[in-house]
């Protein structure tokens, strides 16, 4: 098998550009934001670039101040960055919001069939009796990440 050759400086510069572009986007507390910020948090975990974590923290704090939406499966995607923020800052507010998402998923989220989480984009029940692959990321993987905190 051939050795993987890469330019670390170029990769980190590319990550910087992606992070900067992402942070210029006007995103709300929903699936796109949750997935994007999860990516930035993962970039932080790999590079240890504190700026990435601070950018996510500042934006999440701003969104918290503006007010949290009603929970849906889609809005639970933001839980991933909340877990990362709690892990690295120790600030309980992030954990408390994540726990409220867990409670929603366990007790209130719409389900069908054999207790399968239903894909919900809004409170209008847009996709009755549907489970999507991204539901696994937004809800299933999130629940796995919170096990040691709940």
Listing of model-derived features with the role each one plays in the protein:
Residues 79-81, 85-135:
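Extracytoplasmic mature domains of secreted/periplasmic and thylakoid-lumen proteins
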Residues 24-26, 32, 127:
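Alpha-helical structural elements
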Residues 150:
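Conserved small/polar residues in nucleotide/adenosyl-binding loops
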Residues 9-27, 51-70, 96-116:
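Long, well-ordered core segments of solenoidal/helical folds
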Residues 29-44, 71-87, 131-147:
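Well-ordered alpha-helical segments within folded domains of soluble proteins
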Residues 4-6:
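N-terminal amphipathic/basic leader segments beginning at the initiator methionine
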């Amino acid at each position: 098998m051939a050795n993987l050759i890469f330019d670390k400086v170029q990769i980190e510069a590319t990550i910087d550009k992606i992070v900067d572009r992402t942070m210029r986007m006007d995103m709300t507390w929903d699936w796109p934001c949750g997935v994007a910020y999860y990516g930035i948090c993962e970039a932080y975990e790999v590079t240890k670039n504190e700026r990435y974590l601070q950018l996510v923290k500042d934006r999440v704090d701003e969104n918290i101040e503006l007010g949290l939406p009603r929970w849906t499966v889609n809005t639970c995607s933001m839980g991933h960055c909340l877990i990362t923020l709690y892990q690295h800052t120790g600030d309980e507010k992030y954990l408390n919001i994540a726990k409220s998402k867990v409670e929603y998923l366990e007790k209130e989220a719409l389900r069908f069939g054999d207790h399968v989480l239903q894909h919900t984009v809004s409170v209008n029940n847009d996709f009755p009796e549907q489970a999507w692959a991204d539901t696994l990321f937004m809800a299933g993987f999130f629940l796995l990440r919170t096990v040691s905190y709940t």
